[in-house]
Amino acid sequence: MAEITAALVKELRERTGEGMMDCKKALTKAGGDIEKAIDDMRASGAIKAAKKAGNVAAEGAIAIKDDGKAAVIIEVNSQTDFLALQDDFKNFVAASVEKAFADKLTDVAPLIEAQETARLVLVGKVGENVNIRRLKRIEGDVVGSYLHGNKIGVVVTLKGGNVELAKDIAMHVAASNPEFLFPSEVSAEAIEREKSVFLQLNEDKIKGKPAEIVEKMVGGRITKFLAEASLVEQAFVKNPEIKVGDLAKKAGAEIVSFTYFKVGEGIEKPVDNFADEVAAQLAAAKQ
């Protein structure tokens, strides 16, 4: 029996896309013979699913489960938007968020582990990669959520108020995507960058103007920037006459937090060359 070295495990992982522990188990069972391990994994159906792990999954869905006091929000990715609309994928997402909520999970790793068998079955059936990407559990005095087409999900927590108010504010967050809750959370560096950009863009307008006038112009831009970036300072989408922060105060509530998930956020999608894609399809058709 050949020694099961880290290098051997790494090679099998690179060739199959399977996890380190699964590769080690397969090599042990195969007596250290990597080719036999691959054959065994193919026979079990594991590789058919895992080989697709190299494909970028940047589409998918956001799902939320809440009960007014707690919520779980997850992102599950697929390679194509078409799959994200299919019942098999939707059922997997629904089962995953139910599991996460029922088990009060606060980290995505246990959910990935718990759903791995179901994921492999799904991948083997649909022929493309599927990943549970992230999860967050939120608890509070009042918790409300909003889903926009399963592509954007928001959870808002309040101190005071009610679930309907939290849902309204969550809907606003989905539409406006604020960076911060309060203006005080905006870093000095961000403000300085905004000042610098403003001065560069308006170089001709401020040339020759007194320093105090320039200062007022910059101050006006920063005030607008803070209003655009901070949830409590934004005009409420349902009634632009009132700020979101004032809306909450009027209802005797305080906004404690918001969580915003968007499908594919931060995932680098491959840019396909259309000509190459057509050429590849024509070549495949001739075989």
UniProtKB/Swiss-Prot annotation:
Under the heading NCBIfam families, the entry gives: tsf
Q: What would you give as a GO molecular function for this chain, any one?
A: translation elongation factor activity
Q: What does this protein do?
A: Associates with the EF-Tu.GDP complex and induces the exchange of GDP to GTP. It remains bound to the aminoacyl-tRNA.EF-Tu.GTP complex up to the GTP hydrolysis stage on the ribosome.
Compartmental location: Cytoplasm
Q: According to its UniProt record, where is this protein mainly located?
A: cytoplasm
Q: Cellular component per GO?
A: cytoplasm
Q: Name one Pfam family in it.
A: EF_TS
List the CDD domains: UBA_EF-Ts
What is the name of this protein?
Answer: Elongation factor Ts
Does this UniProt record's set of keywords contain Cytoplasm?
Answer: yes
